[in-house]
Amino acid sequence: MVFGKLKKNDITNRYYAFSSFPGEIKEFYDKQLDSEIHTISYNNYQIPSMLEYHLKPLKPSISINGPDYHPVIFEYWYQDIELTGQDLYILQKNSNELQRISKDCEDYSLLKKFLTKRDNSIISEFYLYSCKQFSGEIRKLPTLLF
């Protein structure tokens, strides 16, 4: 019961921000996407974490970090995964980041836009893109050396 109280009084939208993942996004992934293709997110570690938690994809979801973003554990967990030359799905919360990573794709197209709502108000938008033949130029791993 405590969670219900917290969720109802959540002024940060923390409990709502990814509420489209177990429903609409999971359904789209299950019915429309190729499970053999990795999903990446640029400069965002939360999206791959939520995909792993809610969708449990066959191929791991990965955060790709640019030089302007702090290193995250994905860089070390998956540094051996070769993405260069592969087709990928890109899921982003901010459409501005998509412009940065689109340069690394031979072909780039919007598959679907997902809306997350709270009480009929949109609190976040997620953009799912298809990236053909990822060049890998943006992925310089690891960005933090021990």
Give the ranges of each region predicted by the language model.
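Aromatic/acidic, Gly/Pro-rich catalytic loop(s) in extracytoplasmic/lumenal soluble domains
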Residues: 29, 69-146
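Short periplasmic/luminal acceptor-recognition loop of GT-C membrane glycosyltransferases, typified by
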Residues: 7, 11-71
